Amino acid sequence: MKASMFLALAGLALLFVVCYASESEEKEFPIELLSKIFAVDVFKGEERGCKGFGDSCTPGKNECCPNYACSSKHKWCKVYLGK
């Protein structure tokens, strides 16, 4: 009983240390994850001439960034699946 309580407290202490040490890395994790999923930097839309995910577009015009296509149904840029 004492050993299991000690292991539980040691585990919680270790979890606290790991969370505290990785706190600064966790703040950038969602941005890195989205950048890798969509293969473009979706957070710098003002710097580029193309439109990113969810931006309104006109079907037929090549306004969307690479890896995106303008949806004729919804009229916004979405991920191009190659169909």
Curated annotation (Swiss-Prot):
Subcellular location: Secreted
Record-level GO cellular component terms: extracellular region; host cell presynaptic membrane
Propeptide: 22-48
Keyword entries, A-Z: Amidation, Disulfide bond, Ion channel impairing toxin, Knottin, Neurotoxin, Presynaptic neurotoxin, Secreted, Signal, Toxin, Voltage-gated sodium channel impairing toxin
One Gene Ontology term of the molecular function aspect: ion channel inhibitor activity
Tissues and organs where the protein is expressed, per its UniProt entry: Expressed by the venom gland.
Entry-annotated residues carrying Leucine amide: 81
InterPro entries associated with the record: Huwentoxin-1, Huwentoxin_CS1
Disulfide bond sites: 50-65, 57-70, 64-77
Keyword Disulfide bond: yes
Database matches in PROSITE patterns: HWTX_1
Secretion signal, residue range per the UniProt entry: 1-21
Record flagged with keyword Ion transport: no
Domain comment, as recorded: The presence of a 'disulfide through disulfide knot' structurally defines this protein as a knottin.
Subunit structure: Monomer.
Function: Selective antagonist of neuronal tetrodotoxin (TTX)-sensitive voltage-gated sodium channels (IC(50)=1270 nM on Nav1.1/SCN1A, 270 nM on Nav1.2/SCN2A, 491 nM on Nav1.3/SCN3A and 232 nM on Nav1.7/SCN9A). This toxin suppress Nav1.7 current amplitude without significantly altering the activation, inactivation, and repriming kinetics. Short extreme depolarizations partially activate the toxin-bound channel, indicating voltage-dependent inhibition of this toxin. This toxin increases the deactivation of the Nav1.7 current after extreme depolarizations.
UniProt family annotation: Belongs to the neurotoxin 10 (Hwtx-1) family. 15 (Hntx-3) subfamily.
Extra remark: Negative results: has no activity on Nav1.4, Nav1.5, Nav1.8 and Nav1.9 sodium and calcium currents.
UniProt name for this protein: Hainantoxin-III 9
Organism: Cyriopagopus hainanus
